Design a protein with these regions (language model features):
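Extracellular/periplasmic Venus flytrap/periplasmic-binding protein
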Residues: 1-40, 79-87
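Surface-exposed patches in mature extracellular/periplasmic domains of secreted proteins
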Residues: 99-106, 126-129, 147-151
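Short, charged, surface-exposed loops that flank catalytic or proteolytic processing sites
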Residues: 120-134
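Solvent-exposed, acidic/polar segments of extracytosolic/periplasmic ligand-binding ectodomains
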Residues: 137-198
């Protein structure tokens, strides 16, 4: 878990010549891989798509121009044009200034809204787990993601987007939403879930 040199993996990718590379390595390893992949020149030949944990705004600020050309698949970005997201991002900026906001904060915000909706859906002094779970599954929240609900296996059903790295007015790179790639997409195994929602 402390690998810093990815020369062997990059050589394997170069030899294999795949149509694309999907990378998921959050934190320092992901930063090292991304920088070395860009330095190798492979990004010009073989596109890279990453998980949002591998390239959020914090990481973009660290790697800078090394992120140019990388694509991200994500269910949230700070430029989403919906009222709840605009309110959330404005509140974040008011409290934290220019500290980068990531999908972790957005998920935490939505999770708190879901918990509140679940609690509002039960009554009495004691909370029954079944009743609470049922209230969660039927909860309607004003999500920062836009359309959002929980599927039968309690995993999100949500839209997914392609993000790219753009240059801001200040000359610094940032993540920009390019297009929606999936609508109301849930866990493909949800139908096989044996969990009793009732």
């Amino acid at each position: 878990m402390d690998q810093t040199d990815f020369a062997a993996e990059i050589a394997q990718i170069r030899a294999a010549k795949p149509a694309m590379v999907y990378e998921f390595e959050p934190g320092g390893m992901g930063i090292a891989f991304l920088q070395q992949y860009q330095q190798s020149g492979l990004l010009k030949e073989i596109p890279m798509v990453v998980h949002p944990a591998s390239l959020d705004q914090v990481i973009v600020n660290v790697v800078g121009k090394a992120a140019d050309g990388v694509r991200v698949t994500s269910h949230w970005n700070d430029d989403f044009d919906n009222p709840e997201n605009k309110k959330f991002v404005a509140a974040w900026k008011a409290k934290f200034g220019d500290r980068p906001i990531t999908y972790y904060a957005a998920q935490g915000y939505d999770a708190a809204l879901m918990m509140g909706a679940g609690l509002a859906g039960v009554s009495g002094d004691e909370i029954d787990a079944k009743t609470f779970r049922k209230a969660l599954l039927s909860a309607q929240i004003p999500s920062v993601r836009g359309e959002f609900k929980l599927g039968p296996n309690q995993h999100p059903v949500q839209d997914w987007y392609a993000l790219g790295v753009a240059e801001g007015a200040n000359g610094k790179p940032y993540l920009k939403t390019e297009k929606k790639v999936l609508t109301a997409h849930g866990d493909i195994y949800a139908a096989q879930c044996k969990m009793d929602a009732e």
